[in-house]
Amino acid sequence: MTRHDATRVIRAATGTTLTAKSWLTEAPLRMLMNNLDPDVAERPQELVVYGGIGRAARDWESFDAIVAALTRLDEDHTLLVQSGKPVGVFRTHADAPRVLIANSNLVPRWANWDHFNELDQKGLAMYGQMTAGSWIYIGAQGIVQGTYETFVEMGRQHYDGNLAGKWLFTGGLGGMGGAQPLAAVMAGASCLAVECRRSSIDMRLRTGYLDTWTDSLDEALRLIEESCTARKPLSVGLLGNVADVLDELLLRGIRPDLLTDQTSAHDPVNGYLPQGWSVEEWDAKRVSAPKEVEAAARDSMANHIRAMLTFHALGVPTVDYGNNLRQMALEAGVDNAFDFPGFVPAYIRPLFCRGIGPFRWVALSGDPDDIAKTDAKVKELIPDDAHLHRWLDMAADKIAFQGLPARICWVGLGDRHRLGLAFNAMVRSGELKAPVVIGRDHLDSGSVASPNRETEAMADGSDAVSDWPLLNALLNTASGATWVSLHHGGGVGMGFSQHAGMVIVCDGSEAADKRLERVLWNDPATGVMRHADAGYAIATDCAKAKGLDLPGILR
């Protein structure tokens, strides 16, 4: 089992020449490779895409075997991938998924980091995060709009909709957290983001998600103060330990205007630098003494949350951004760790009730012009949504593509299938140079059960019911998605979530039209269904307006 190979440099093919037998298998092949592009993945030589140890394949041998299988699949074959390893090719039918993926799933009694790590070390499992092991990660852009929407809503609720002259404090500039600085600036606020790895800071600078950096807190605060005074948003990366910096801000009596965190706290061994440790010591002991790392990290997380709770008590709008930091602190003895809310119940759930979530698409041509044309098509088909148009304009201006050109765009039930059909028509007519794939984050309205994040504080108490993502995966499979994934532990770690993903190819065919209409209606409709079942009036109204047939819910 080879987990590290510094000689491997993977990039997706572009253009219209196929390596596989059809676009329906070429697409997952290119997206797997795109996940490991050096401009996309955090540690591609280790197959790590983002989120601590979120991998695209179990090991390099499995990666090569997946590639070989995808290149030989026929139009009625389905490849099965078990925790990053290809385990079977079966004859199904042309409208079945070409790939079915299950990552990190454990029987609940054994669904914890200790058991998973034991399996992982034996080469029997792989942590797929959400979009790492499901081959639809698009770099930091994948979360930037959701983060932007959250910050805009924080501004609306706490500062009358105006974040000019305000600043956000946060931690973590990895594959997910790296979206925060740009999202804050796009929302009108400055951002001070603490990151312990210089390489992560450098990647955000290189890809345009971060404006500048320093290793001096004094310099960072000076830059933030100047930007706020001038009301010109600026993002500053600070090399350091976020828990240490928060303690220092409290000592100095300095209060940010907004506070959150996106370190990889979900993984106490691989995701969080303990206070007082160097990165080099941490990296060495993650392998040689993982229990020591975990204990030290949990102590630091407790301190981190205590500082956030202090700011919260002082009136600073404080929110958990879904990394399970509060849970880790609770287990370390901070009994009131959940005194401040998670971002979904506080700011995002009304969108989920209407099936609105992180719709994304990728141009397999590799040509950015294909994304520009699809951006224009979105505006044409959704002409009256000024907020969406503003997002698309900002994205075109400020977001650098990582790997294959892509776009994230939060739209919901009734719009997703229209966009999919329009994109397919553009491929068919030759307006787009090659097919596009349409997917989403597993963080969506009907595809995840995560009591400390997406399903926190559900109205009916059904936070932990995980039937919903299972039904979502089954329905997307039946509807004809090109590949479907079912994962455990993404975002918040082992034992705390189950979630499903889907990707579908617009190859220009009439058969694709039928699949797109089914999948891109049914997928967001499960989110409306799930929230209607939980008693949300917004969701029941949406379900009635869209004519959903929900016999046990709408009576």
UniProtKB/Swiss-Prot annotation:
Active-site residues per Swiss-Prot or TrEMBL entry: 409
Alphabetized PANTHER family for the sequence: UROCANATE HYDRATASE
EC nos: 4.2.1.49
MF annotations from Gene Ontology: urocanate hydratase activity
InterPro entries: Urocanase (IPR055351), Urocanase-like (IPR023637), Urocanase_C (IPR035401), Urocanase_central_sf (IPR038364), Urocanase_CS (IPR023636), Urocanase_N (IPR035400), Urocanase_Rossmann-like (IPR035085), Urocanase_sf (IPR036190)
Record-stated family: Belongs to the urocanase family.
Gene Ontology cellular component annotations, sorted alphabetically: cytoplasm
Subcellular location: Cytoplasm
Keyword field: Cytoplasm, Histidine metabolism, Lyase, NAD
Gene3D superfamilies on file: Urocanase like domains, Urocanase superfamily
Catalytic activity: 4-imidazolone-5-propanoate = trans-urocanate + H2O
Protein name: Urocanate hydratase
Entry annotated with the keyword Lyase: yes
PROSITE patterns, sorted: UROCANASE
Superkingdom of source: Bacteria
Pathway: Amino-acid degradation; L-histidine degradation into L-glutamate; N-formimidoyl-L-glutamate from L-histidine: step 2/3
Binding site for NAD(+): 51-52, 129, 175-177, 195, 262-266, 272-273, 321, 491
Cofactor(s) recorded in Swiss-Prot or TrEMBL: NAD(+)
Organism this protein belongs to: Xanthomonas axonopodis pv. citri (strain 306)
